[in-house]
């Protein structure tokens, strides 16, 4: 048990260093927060974070995406025009596809936890090295589900 603790801590430290070296605040902060939680009595909250963290993250992301509508930065006129421009219609179609893939990804990650480690490593590498954003595991899992037929 103690050996597993140290292995997981080392992995988090490596992720923290990768985040620092790549100047990626999301990876750096996430790894740092998880290290603090892991080495303090806050670790009792890991089951809650594991059960609800993904949904909370999606909620926060959705709030961020909808904020331009709520603040008025994206006008009603712009929203209506998005239904008549070819580029916007393609964007809507891609948004639908990505949301569908994300849904498949959540199901796959829940039903086949053995793929989660690979998806996370790929996502963290993409975030740290390619300056991506950490929405990758859901989409990657959705794409994987298409390839493996799940």
Swiss-Prot record:
GO terms for cellular component: plasma membrane. InterPro entries: UPF0756_TM. It comes from the Bacteria. The keyword Cell membrane applies. It is a multi-pass membrane protein. It is found in: Cell membrane. The keyword Transmembrane applies. Keywords: Cell membrane, Membrane, Transmembrane, Transmembrane helix. The chain crosses the membrane at residues 1-21, 45-65, 83-103, 115-135. Coiled coil: none annotated. Belongs to the UPF0756 family. This is UPF0756 membrane protein ACICU_02320. It comes from Acinetobacter baumannii (strain ACICU).
